From Swiss-Prot:
Widely expressed with highest levels in testis and lung. PROSITE patterns: ENKURIN. Keywords: Cell projection, Cilium biogenesis/degradation, Cytoplasm, Cytoskeleton, Microtubule, Phosphoprotein. This is Enkurin domain-containing protein 1. The keyword tRNA-binding does not apply. Disruption phenotype: Severely impaired epidermal barrier function with a significant reduction in the thickness of the granular and spinous layers of the epidermis. Misoriented division of basal keratinocytes and significantly reduced proliferation rate of basal keratinocytes and suprabasal cells. Ciliogenesis defects in multiple organs. Retinal photoreceptor cilia numbers are greatly decreased, leading to defective vision, and there is also a decreased number of renal primary cilia as well as a reduced percentage of ciliated cells in the tracheal epithelium. Impaired cardiac function. Transmembrane segments: none annotated. One of its GO terms (biological process) is motile cilium assembly. Its main location: cytoplasm. Residues 1-24, 88-107, 113-132, 259-280 are annotated as: Disordered. It is found in: Cytoplasm, Cytoskeleton, Microtubule organizing center, Centrosome; Cytoplasm, Cytoskeleton, Microtubule organizing center, Centrosome, Centriole; Cytoplasm, Cytoskeleton, Cilium basal body; Cell projection, Cilium. The lineage of its organism: Eukaryota, Metazoa, Chordata, Craniata, Vertebrata. The keyword Phosphoprotein applies. The gene is Enkd1. Residues 98-107, 113-125 have a biased composition (Basic and acidic residues).
């Protein structure tokens, strides 16, 4: 027999079938936050569902913040204190960055619009009256000399042609006329009505413009002088240097030739036999000249011998002359060569 729920607390839970109304299965904290606290429990009965809906759990306002803090950890909270956020949400204290480019464009457009309005108002406005020039009061009662002269001359006839130059007609170079070429002006006679009357200034100006010497600017004169100097320098170069070998190249070529000859002389002749030396050229020519003189002398002696002499002495003398002539001829052949090698004394 059961008198109600047991008030004894121990490690062994009581049997829930005894008092099902008191031993309900509690919902989790996450389920209560998500709104699942009203789900059907296995131990609930149909009578309880039909009678009245169960009362919702009591949840504090900061429960969701505590749950999110537990899921993210404490590091995110510490970083949020330093204005650094690791989560997907944006900190409410941080403001959106200002777009300076759009702000500058907006200000530029405002300035342009303001200037356009000023230009439009200036164009539509009436012209401002000009300020009168200052005039000294001492000339108030003075009559104009031009007006007095016009009264003296009288009204000009309509049929009389006006002597003046039209636009772009007889335009000269604009240079002042030379004093030497300008014609002498005649003095006005007693019948002249006014100064300058009776002088044809148009003809005088045209004549002075034709006779005026043509003057060049300073830059053109300097340019002409420089071009003349360049032309003279080019002509001088063509006459003295163009097509000619420079002197330093000629000197260098002679030096190279002398060095080549010296190297050739210093090198041993490959045709020279061992133990011999080359006879100098002057000594060779001197020896050849002596041999030619000896040959001519022996030929003269051979010719002067008597033809009918058959003695042994005459025959021996003739044989000696022939032998010497043969030796001299052989020596002449040797010393007539360009190179003569002499055996060195050991």
């Amino acid at each position: 027999m059961c008198e109600g729920p047991s008030r004894i607390s121990g490690p062994i839970p009581p049997d829930p079938t005894l008092c099902p109304d008191y031993y309900r299965r509690p919902a989790s904290a996450q389920g209560r936050l998500e709104g699942n606290a009203l789900k059907l429990d296995l131990l609930t009965s149909g009578r309880d569902l039909d009678s009245s809906p169960p009362r919702g759990p009591r949840i504090r306002p900061e429960a969701r913040e505590i749950l999110e803090r537990g899921q993210r950890g404490v590091g995110d909270v510490l970083l949020q204190l330093g204005c650094i956020s690791l989560g997907s949400g944006v900190s409410p204290k941080r403001k959106n960055p200002k777009d300076h480019e759009k702000e500058n464009l907006r200000r530029i457009k405002e300035i342009q619009r303001r200037f356009q309005d000023q230009e439009r108002s200036r164009e539509q406005g009436q012209p401002k009256p000009l300020k009168a020039l200052w005039r000294s009061p001492k000339y108030d009662n003075v009559e104009s000399r031009v007006k007095a002269r016009m009264k003296e001359l009288g009204p000009t006839s309509v049929t009389e042609p006006a002597h003046f130059l039209r636009a772009h007609s007889r335009c000269g170079p604009g240079l002042p006329p030379s004093r030497a070429s300008s014609p002498q002006l005649a003095l006005p006679g007693p019948q002249a009505k006014g100064p300058g009357l009776g002088v044809d200034f148009i003809s005088r100006n045209a004549l002075a413009a034709k006779r005026a010497p043509r003057r060049h600017s300073r830059s053109l004169q300097v340019l002409a002088q420089v071009q003349e100097q360049q032309r003279q320098a080019q002509e001088r170069y063509n006459a003295t240097q163009k097509g000619h070998v420079p002197h330093y190249l000629l000197e260098r070529r002679d030096l190279w030739r002398k060095e080549a000859e010296a190297r050739q002389r210093s090198q041993p002749d490959p045709s020279m036999p061992p133990g011999h030396t080359l006879m100098p050229e002057n000594q060779r020519l001197e020896t050849l000249n002596n041999l030619l003189q000896s040959q001519s002398q022996l030929l003269r002696e051979l010719v002067l011998l008597p033809a009918g002499a058959d003695s042994l002495r005459a025959q021996g003398h003739r044989a000696e002359l022939d032998r010497k002539l043969v030796q001299i001829e052989e020596a002449i052949k040797i010393f007539s060569r360009p190179k003569v090698f002499v055996k060195m004394d050991t």
